[in-house]
Amino acid sequence: FLGGLMKIGAKLLPSVIGLFKKKQ
């Protein structure tokens, strides 16, 4: 379960960082 969460997080992280950079 934890491994699955980390895989999902690894996929979402770049998108979240991209959105955060666009806002600044």
Swiss-Prot record:
Tissue: Expressed by the venom gland.
Gene Ontology biological process: defense response to bacterium; defense response to fungus; killing of cells of another organism
Sorted UniProt keywords: Antibiotic, Antimicrobial, Fungicide, Membrane, Secreted, Target cell membrane, Target membrane, Toxin
CC terms in the record's Gene Ontology section: extracellular region; membrane; other organism cell membrane
Coiled coil: none
Subcellular location: Secreted; Target cell membrane
Record's function text: Has a broad spectrum of activity against both Gram-positive and Gram-negative bacteria and S.cerevisiae. Has insecticidal and hemolytic activities. May act by disrupting the integrity of the bacterial cell membrane.
Protein name: U1-poneritoxin-Na1a
